[in-house]
Amino acid sequence: MKKNRLSFWLLLPCFVGMMLLCGKNMLEHPLTTSLKTSSQPTFVQKWYTALQMQLGNRQRNGVYIGETALYALPQPLSETALSDTADVINQFYQETELPICVTAIPDAASFYSDAFPDGMPYVEQKPAIKQFYNAIDLHIRKTDAYYILEAESNDYIYYRTFPYWTSYGAYSVYRSVIQKLGFVPISYDHYTVSHVKSDARGALYQATQTDAVMPDLIDVYENNSNPLTCTVTTTLQDGSKKERDSLYDADALQTENPYQFYLGEPAPLQVVTTNVQNGKKLLVI
């Protein structure tokens, strides 16, 4: 088996030359198809992505490789899922009558469609999100994040290699959401922003294995005028609990998913207890 693998790597340069000579049709060869899988060594995946880009194909594993960022190819939002979600929110409000603010966050492609080539199929999420808002009870506050983020689209509001918004993108929307909940937003000037990781690469990078796009920054916002101390109790899928004395999970910065630095690994329930003594509770779903 080892001998066969060695033979493959020795023949790889010849295979590269054949692909360059034969053009895109060679990409349908069974051997080429096997190179598309994530089970291949990382350097093979990097080589395959680079080759595709040389041949003009900037898509891989559902991700488009832009000039400055990676984008998950836009997918249509499920009308059934949106309708079911709206029904659950409405029912929760009817049972509790608690003040609620709902915000739907579009994907990055919604704001950077000019990064895609002309003629490429594109799914616009805005109409589906509008329909979702219309299905929510009129007594529930809604914040249309689309217009807020669109106004900030020249700034670093979405990660380049993760399918998420950045801390600044979230802060931009927070300013509107918190006002609708009856609070005064904390001014950006009151925060000190620290880069806890400057070479973060996320799921979009893992899907493409391309170094053509700069890595991301993982930031922490600290309010100097009112330092926050807290404990986080996490209930895991198996019912067990873990506790830490920080909102952040520093160990995650050394893993393949450094985004889990924020709040830690996915879990059904997390309870954050802070030093704020105002008698109020906030439920985030």
Cite the ranges covered by each PLM segment.
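Extracellular glycan-modifying ectodomains
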Residues: M1-I285
